[in-house]
């Protein structure tokens, strides 16, 4: 599928998820929630810094790249334990999408939603 079609479909799906089962709602309540304001950074480096500020205690140097994002999502950097289920609420998503561009935004979303990367992250997108 072409990128131009993939991102809008993914965003639409995230904004209009299927109703959660009772069990899924209970599991979501038990997650540590992080809120990312998409209007709080102006470039990719700012995005990575903001993620590190939100999800680490600042005692470990993290990289400004997609691999570091994946590591931070896994946990173990002072805020959530390694492998602990988390939820990321991404506010002002369209601002971030414009700032980061569609190719990087799609790669970030793919990492966040990829359950095979040893992290358990629910994503909610708000505009």
Each language-model region and where it sits:
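N-terminal intrinsically disordered, low-complexity segments enriched in P/E/S/T
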Residues: 1-60, 76-127
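A short, aromatic/hydrophobic, helix- or strand-capping loop or linear motif
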Residues: 61-66
């Amino acid at each position: 599928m072409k990128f131009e079609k993939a991102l809008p479909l993914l965003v639409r799906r995230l904004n209009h998820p299927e109703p959660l089962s009772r069990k899924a709602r209970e599991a979501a309540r038990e997650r540590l929630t992080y809120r990312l304001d998409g209007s709080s950074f102006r470039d990719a480096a700012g995005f990575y810094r903001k993620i590190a500020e939100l999800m680490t205690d600042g005692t470990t140097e993290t990289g400004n790249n997609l691999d570091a994002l994946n590591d931070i999502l896994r946990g173990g950097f002072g805020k959530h334990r390694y492998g602990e289920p988390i939820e990321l609420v991404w506010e002002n998503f369209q601002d971030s999408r414009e700032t980061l561009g569609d190719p990087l935004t799609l790669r970030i979303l793919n990492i966040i939603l990829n359950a095979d990367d040893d992290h358990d992250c629910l994503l909610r997108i708000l505009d």
